[in-house]
Each structure stands twice: as C-alpha cells, then as structure tokens.
Amino acid sequence: MWRFPLILASVCWLTTAQQQNVANDPDKKLASFDACKADIHKHCSRPDVDLTSDMSILECLQDAGFSETATLSEQCEQLVWDFKVKITQDERFVSAAKQYCEEELKGNAAMNLCTSQTQPGFALSCLMEFTKNVTETGKCHAFLARTERLAFSDFRLVGPFVTKCRAILDKFKCNVLTPDPAHKGVRVAHTQGMALECILDKVVKNAKTQADALQILGDDCKHEVLRLAEMQADDFHLDRPLFFACRLDRERYCKDVPSGEGKVFECLMMNRNDKFMDPECGNLLAERAYLMGRDYRMAHPLTKACQPELTRYKCEPQNQIESAAHFHLAWILLCLENGANQPEHKEVQPSKECAHEMITHRQMMMQHFRMAPELVLNCAQEIDKWCSPRGDIEAEGRTLHCLMEHAESRNETLKLGAQCLQAVQQVVKVADIGRNYKVDKVLYGSCRSLIDGPCAQDAVSETATLTCLMRNVDSPDMVPECEKRLLEVQYFMARDWTMDPQLYEACHQEAVSRCSALDNWHQQHNSDNTVDRGPQVLACLYRSAYDEQNPLSVKCGTQVRQLLHVRAVRVNLIPEIEDSCREALSEFCSHNVKPSEEMMCLQQNFETDNFKRKHPQCFAELTKFTEMEAKDTKLNRALSKACKPVISTHCAQFANEEIDHGDVLECLVNNKDAKEMNNKCRSYVNHFELISLRDYHFSYKFQKACASDIEQSCKGHNNDKGEIIRCLSEVRFEHKVLGSPKDLTDDCKKQLKVAYLQQEQVEFDDKEHMADADPKLSQKCEQEIKMYKCNQADTFEDTIECLRLNFEHLGPECKSMIFYREKIEAVDNSMDDELQKKCRYDIGKFCANSDSENVLECLTNTKIVRLLQRECKAIVKERMQESARDVRLRPQLLTSCRKEAEQYCPEDMKKINMPQYSQTVLDGVVVSCLRDKFRQSISDQNHIDFSPRCSAEVSRAIVEAEFDPQLDPPLYNACKSTINDHCSATIMESGGHFDNVMECLKNDFNKGLIRDKQCSEQVARRLQESLVDIHLDPVLHEACAMDIQRYCRDVPPGHSRIVMCLMDSADKQELSKECSTKLSDRNKLWMKAHSEFQMALPDSWHAFANLVMEHPERNSILGYLAGFIVFILLIGCCCGRVSKKQYIEMKNR
C-alpha cells in the first residue's frame, strides 16, 4: 500500500507568483495557464473532457495518477492545488452552490445553513452531507458530486477534518512531508486522499488489540473520519487510494457496474479472493471492509435497498454513538433477518432488492473476516498463529473456515479462545448459512459435486440442499473436503437453534415459551439482561420432542426430530454431549475410533462404574440421549445406515412412523437371520441390545409398559435391567405358581417376555461384553463360566444353557441365578428360547394346538417324547430333569395339587412360600410328599383321596421317571452306581436311550443282584407306585393294552382296580400270552417288594388271592386252598341252598 506523508500547510509548496496569478485574475480558465498546458494536452485531449470547464480539467488531471507529484509537472501540480482551493473554499463556491442548488436550499433549511459557514472548507463539508438527499438527476447533485471528487482527492480541502483531526494527524505523522529539516527543498510526492488513508491504516492495525479501534482518534476526529469514510464508500471515485489501486481490477471485474451507491466497491469485494486481483487493491478492500463492519452506513447498496425494512423492523440505531454495537453491519444484518422472521412481518417480506443485498453482504462477511470487527479484535492471535502464517490474509476467503476448524478441535493447544469462539459464532450466525448455503463459497465449492449430483433433486430450496448434504455425510459420494467444511458449519448451527431457518420458523413460539429463548434473538443486549442460552435451547427442544406427556406441536416436534436425526451422525453436533464428554472421549475413544463411531464408543463404556465415577455429567447426558435413541431408532444413524436393506424389506411399516418407539430395533432383532442381514448391521444391533440390557430405561416399550409394576414391586433394584427382569419374573412366578395376589399388568407381561427373549438372544461381537447381558449373573457365575468354558458361547442363552447342563456342579450363588431363569421359563415355555428353537419342527408337528406357554407339557407326553427329533428330545429331557429337582419348576403339578399339598404336606408348602427359599432349589420338597401320599392311597384305610387333576399330574411325574430315572432324583441318586455297573450294556443296546433303565433295575431287583440297600428300597417304592394304577407301569400297560380294552374297559383307574381286574382275568386264563407273562413277572416283583420291604398291597382279599396265585410258593399255598375249598363243598352238600348262598356272597365279595 502506498504510504506518503501529507503536508497541511500549503505555504510550504505554493509560490507567491502563482498565488498572485490566480488571485489577480480569478476568471481566467485553467486551460489558459502556461503551467498546465503541456499536462492538459498530455492527459486530457479526449472527447469526454470539456476543456472550457475548470472542473472537468481538474477531474481529468487528478484521475491521471494516484500521485499528482509523479504525474504532473511541478508548476501544474501547484496550479491544480490553487484551483481546487479556489473552487471549494472561497466565497465563489458558496455562490456556485446557491446557483446550482437554489431549489434544494429553499426546501431544506438545514442545508441552507451550510451556506453561512465562513471557515475555509466548512461550507463544502456541510453541503456534502446532503448529497444523498438531493435528486440524483438534478444539477445540484451533479455539482456537489463533482465538488466532492475534488475534496476527496485532498482532505485539506475539508475544513472540519483538518481542524478536528489536526492533533491526530500530527500524532501519527500523517501530515509531514519532510520529517527532517535536512530534507528542506526536496520535492516529496503528494498522494491523493492519503491523509485519511494514513489514519485508517493506524486504526486497522489498532483493531487487533482494541475493542474500539477508532477510540484512539477521539470523539470529534472519529466522527469526521467515519463521516468521510461513509461518503467515499458511496462513490468509488471519491475513494482516491482505492480508485487508483483498483482501477484495472474495476475494468476486469466490474466493467458494467456504474459508480455510485457503493456498487463498485461491492462488486470488487465479491471478487477480492480472485487470484488475479492486484494485491494492493485487495489490501485496501480489506481495510474498507473493516470500516464497513464497524459502520453499516458504508454499506450503501444495503442501506438503500433495505431502507423501508430498516425502518419497519426498527433496526436503525437510536443512539448516535458510532462505537455502539448497533452500528455494526453484523447487528444490522441480524436485525433484518430477525424482523423478516417475526410472525407479524410474515405477510410483508423484504423486497427482492433488499433480500439480494442481505445475501450479498452475508456472503462478503463469510469471505472477508475483517468485516467483523469483533473477529479482528478477538481472533487476532489465532489468525496470526493458524490462519495467516506468513502474515498475509489467507487466500480464497478461508480465514473464517480456518477458525471454524479450530473451534471444533478437542486439542486444547489448538482450540480457539472463548472470546474468539464467540466472535466466530456471531459471524456464522450473521452469514445465516442455514438459509442459503451459497453465501459460503468455500462450502459451496467443496460440495459442488454432491450438490449437482445426489442432492440435485433436493434443490427445491437451499435449506433442503444443505439437509441433503448432511444426510449424505457418511455416504460413498461424500468427498473429504466437503465433509470437513460441512461439519465445520454444522458445528456452529448445532449450537444456536436460530441458525436453522426451518427450526426457527416451526418452533419459535415454543422455544420462547418452553425453553426460555429470546424472542428477538439478534439482540446482544436487552433490558431484562436475559442471555440466549444457545445450545441449552436446542437441548430443551430435543427433550421436548420426545415428551409424550406435554408434547410439542406437530410441526415443531417433526422438525426437531428430523434435525436431530441428521445431527446424530456426529458427537460434536450434539453440544451437550460433546461439551460434557471431552475427557471421556479422550480417555476411551481417542485411538482408532472414527468420528462417526464415537457415540457407539461412548455407549460401550458409559455404564461402567469407572466411567460413572470419573465422568458423571457425561454419563447423565449419554443416558438422556440413549433413552431418546431407544424411542426413535432413526437417531442411531450408524445402525440405520448399515441396516437399511433389512429395514426396507422387513421393518418398513415401523420405519415410516414418526417415532417408532423401538419397533424398528425389535424388528431387526427378530430378523437377525434374514438374508438381507449383514455383519455390520448385526454388530450394531448387538451393540444396542447390550446397551439396552444394562439399563431398562433404554428399552422404551419395556419401561413404559412396566413403569407402574417396577415402581410397585422392584423399586430397590436401581436401573439394572437384568435385575428388573428377574424381579418382575419373580412377581409373575409367585402369582401364577404360588398363588400370590400380586401380578403384573398385561402390557408388562408382554414386554417382559420380549425383554427376556432379547436378553436370551443377544450375541457378542466382543466376549468382554458378555457380562453386559446380565451383570449380576455374570458376576456370581464368573468362576463356573470359565470352568465349564461357557464363555465360548456365541449368545447369552448358550452361556446359560451351558451352566444349566452343569447345574449340579455350580456354586450356591450361581445355582440361585440359574434357578431364577428356570422358574420363569417353566411358568411360560414361550420364554424358553432354546426349547422353542430346537423344537420348532416338533412343536408344529405334535403340539400345534397347544398353548405356547405350556408347550413343554405336550412335548413331555410319553407317547410324543419318544418320537421327537434328537436335538429336540435332548433339550426336552434336560428340561424334564430340571423340573424334577424342584416342584416349582412343575407349575402344572403345583397348581393342580395345591389343595392336596396344603392338606397332606403343609410343612413343605410353607417352605416353598418362604422368601429365604425363593432362590434355593428344594430337592423333592412337596413332590416326594405327594408321591408318598399317592402311594398310600392304594389302601382305602388311609383315607387319602386325590382329585383327578392332581392324580393325573402325580401319575405323569411317575410315568416320566419310567423313561428316565433321572426324573426321580431319590431313585437315581441311590442307584447311580448300580445303573453304571449293571445297566450300561442295556443302554448301549437300546442305542444310547434310557428307556430300558428301569426295566434293567427291576430285573436286577427280581434276581437279587442289587446290593445297595437304598437302591433296592427306591426300586420297591417305584413298584408300589406303579401298583396304584397300571398306567404308571408303561411296559405292563403297553403289553396288556388289548386285554384292558377287552376285559377291563369299564373299570375306573386308580386304587389298583385295573391290575386286580387283569389278575381276575388271568385266573380265568383269558389274558393274552404277552400280557399274562408280563403280569406274572410284575407279580413276582410286587411280592418280593412286599416280603422284603413291606410294600403295601391292595385291601381286596380277592386281589390278594390272585397275587398269591402268582407267588413262587403257590403250589403249597394252592394245596391248602384246595383242601379248604373241598371242606366248604362238603358243608354245602349238607346244608343245601344256605351254603350255596354263603358261597355266592363270598364269591361276590
């Protein structure tokens, strides 16, 4: 930039002769003086120069070059100065003004007062104030405009400026040609307009350290400087340094732009970052931009186009202190934007011209950071350090984006200071990129390929295009530079709700009423001293968008959710999370974690005790967000993107809902095996499943459906979902099995089942997270999980199944945790996912009509269990063995026999209802007692009577044990060694099945091969149980099935009636050979059990006689009986019909 001192005292370079010439002949024309003839001929011999007009010649000569000293001869330079003084400062100027502006002076009293100013240059200065008020086409305007051009070439001609700024000119040495007397007589260049330029240079340099850089001038001089700067900003020709520095650039970029109203300056500013622009022109434009930022009145195109709007929206500053923030261009632009968006102004929008100028000036502000004085002041260090390493202005208008990049940095050494950050935020707000992204040329240029490509169809508005860009931020089409610039802009938009025009329009009233937002958000200061809370307003709107008790309006709620869906792509676009979690991100997510995966990283760690202790605020914010995410799956951008094929095919009906309330995730869980499911989607689904398992609040439907039940029954279990599931399951179990009056609501029952199955089916991408499925169970079974290699399982249910298979070897605490799960699955078989999966085919084939909650009852039917597929049979037998351990795992038996159990087994019933035994397996309690009573019911003398339902359930338990001795724990535990020693060959012969174990034991018992007395006692017990009813001896029942149909069809079961009926038929030799043989074998066993272990026999004598007939010593016994019968016959012969009648009665008995 040119910098030459200016001398104020004309006496130093005026010659007395020239003064006398001009003074002596005041009417002589400039062209007639010999001093300038050569210069006029050289520079002004053009058709457009009127050589008869001194004004026209003066304009031509001063336009010949920036430095008149370098352009004109010494004599002509002095003569030009004399004529400028003559034209502008003596009484002839006033006379001319009265001539050309006669009408205007009559109509404007204030303007007329200017003609009474007598001090040199004061009348000129005063009249220049009214140039913009006179008609542009009139002769007065032409006169004043041409005079202004002369005055602005040398500010010594402007009297008030010289007077009021003399001290400043001296202080900054803006008035000294030769600072050293030794230079006396040396001709130093005089540069047009340089006095003001010298002052402006000092002001701009001072702007880096002073809030009000103009304050160094003092109030009087500052007023004059701003006044002159405002006037010269209106006309390109008045800004002489700019005129000469940008003369070629004006021809290059703004050839067709007419001078006046600041149009040329605006055009040059829009092209300032072009690489072909002259650097000197660019530097001067930057200085002017700073002044325009300080005083909006220098933005003439804006003030003229928007004058009605400035008045209507009350944006014109009321106090006239130029240093006030209300004079800043940023404030004016914000005020105009705010006014246009106020409901009362909706019907009268800004004119097209005003809207255009607003966009243009916003665009200039994005490109030229100097237009924001606060930015120049508060970001000077940051700009010098990071954005202008060579001390120049960063090319292509990227300074602001450079600062924006550092604003979002998490590296404390690279972050902006608080004041600079606030200044950047203010500029971004003024630019209003959300309304028109094109004001940000850097963003527009970086994202052009996407704007013209994937987002072309969204170009219905600039706002829609910007939203489209955000939707594609992680798409393959996104280019790194666009992503970077887009997220820099979104970082600030995410921290000020007013920067999103659609959100502002939809939610303005609710933001003010519900979230304490300022009604007029452009105001930096207000009477109530209320500060717009920025991110807090957005956070409030986010929470309110999912508040179903007090919801936002449909329009606002929809807009907030759509916005949050877009911004959930990055943690730093959710300020309440990023600001609270910076340390946590650094600790847990700083290595090999992509920005798009930071949320997942935080969620994987945030529920650990260590995290909660070190980062409580971060934990609280993540909890709030994850609750919203559980309610609205679209917030999980990574999952939504990875699972798009599955969602489109299987979950579209849920995805299209405004809020899916977790249905999409539930659908994805249910479709993990779908062909559209990919590894990435499955991983994201597993991730969120694990999160939701840690805290029941993260399962929206579960939380909502079970809130009252949790409050009533599970209040002391905190938020651990595993504990809540256990607690609710216990409530349901106690109601259904133990008869407790308290039960769950129907909705909670449904969601409990969903939650339980979700817990069962969760998979582990990382085995370290296995414990998250049920932390308490994992803790109490930690050793067992390692010991039996259950940690190698792929799903949680496989881990549990592994522990169930090793139940007898588990520690007490681990047993209690597994027992909890066994109980709820016994109550509702549909919650037994392992059973449902492995028996799906057999359930469909054999149990299609069975209640899903009790499908195990169907599968364990002795006629069905032998026909099941191998995998299903194995799991069914495992469940049968589990149910044999504790009567509470046989809910059907317990409910059917409740009356009998309370009558015959009161102590046992009391025990299973005691809280201290709720987690303890009570082997044989109730069942052993009921079976014992059932056995005793063989004798009528015991007066034991079982209801049909109870009798059927006890019989079922006995029959099931016939096929698997493990279902009779007392027998199996007593005979385990005998089975291993004696029956292993029999098992192998049957193909590995246990169906023949009981037959093997009975055979050994008959032969006396069982040496273990306890085992023999248990076999004898089993024989007595089977004697109660033939159905309890499946082998005998199968052998005699046809005979029972033929001879005992009408005999009711129980109390050995059918057995006695068959014995009676055997006496008559009516039975089939197979049945007779098997009955004879069983009779031997019964008699042996009776003789050795006092097994009770039926009360009927006849039945006993039939048993005796099959006794091993039956020959001698029958001999005695035959003699007795002969004796009776002899008596009958003697007594006739009396004896016959007695015989008949005996026979009937």
Swiss-Prot record:
Subcellular localization, as worded in the UniProt entry: Membrane
Keywords: Glycoprotein, Membrane, Repeat, Signal, Transmembrane, Transmembrane helix
Residues with glycosylation annotation: 133, 411
Cys-rich GLG1 repeats: 24-69, 71-135, 139-207, 216-276, 277-344, 349-411, 415-475, 477-549, 551-610, 613-676, 677-736, 743-803, 809-867, 868-938, 945-1009, 1010-1070
Protein's membrane topology: Single-pass type I membrane protein
Extracellular face residues: 20-1115
Transmembrane segments: 1116-1136
GO molecular function, one term: fibroblast growth factor binding
Keyword Mitochondrion part of the UniProt annotation: no
Residues making up the signal peptide according to the UniProt record: 1-19
Record-given protein name: Golgi apparatus protein 1 homolog
Organism: Caenorhabditis elegans
